[in-house]
Structures are given as structure tokens and as C-alpha cells.
Amino acid sequence: MPNYRIHKTEYIDETKRVSFKYDGKTYFGYEGDTLASALLANGIHLVGRSFKYHRPRGIVSCGAEEPNAICQIGSKKDLTEPNVRATELELYEGLEASSQNCWPNVKFDIGGINNFISPLIPAGFYYKTFMWPKSFWKKVYEPLIRLSAGLGKSPTEPDPDIYDHK
């Protein structure tokens, strides 16, 4: 594991190693790390793609204001959480996270073609482009727009946890 840590801090306990998966690969961090700090310590800088043109994005801050490091947490269909900021998620053993808004992966994203055809898709083009025929909206246009939007995938199965309210 490459170690790109700058210095030791009182918040990260380097005696307690924690393993986690990001985009299917196993990495290691330490207790007290956030997902973002562990990714940077492992040399992972590309963590997402921009919404419209799918340009590469990296971690630019260390708090709740982070615009780029937005991840999908969990791999099961009933226990997954989209749109989690990597800068706010503390590492735990067995964490499974993946990047969002890219296909097939964050390094090679098919949506990156939008960057080359950007003159054809100015701001608000979808408000005028997808108006006709009206019957295409539900079956064709809306699913395509949703696929290209930078949102994570919500759980497809019911929540297996029990919440007892008294």
C-alpha cells in the first residue's frame, strides 16, 4: 500500500488498521480516517465525474462542503445509501463504497463523450430538445436523463432493519 500521509495526527490511530473496498478494490486505512483521507493516503485522487460533462473530479476540501467525493455506500440491494460525502464518512471495517456518476468506472467513463459534444448541449438544452413527441417522455427521454444525472442508486429492496417505535 503506498503511503501518501503527510504527518501523524492525534485523530488517526495508526496502530489500528482498517480494511475497506472502493470500486471493488481493497484498500487499508486507519481508525479515525475518513473515506476521503484514506483514499488520498492510498494514492486515489480521481473520485468522481462532473454532472453534465463527466469531467474528472478529485477531493478539494475536508468537510461537508466537498462537492466531488460523493459515493455510494454498501453493495447489497437493500442496504445501500447513495450520495454520501467521503469527507464525512469515518472508515469502519468492511466498508464498501463506490464512485457515482460514471460508467463503467471512474477512470474510463463513457459519459465523458459529453465533454467533446459540449457545443451541442448548452445550458437548458433538455428543456427544448425533449418536447416532441410527447409519448416519448415517460419511456425514452426521462429514463435517459435520469441515467445521465449524477445521482446514486437508491435501494431496490425493502429495508431489512426493524424500527420499533413505542
What is each stretch, according to the model?
Residues 39:
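Carbohydrate-associated surface elements
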Residues 51-166:
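Fe-S ferredoxin-like electron-transfer domains
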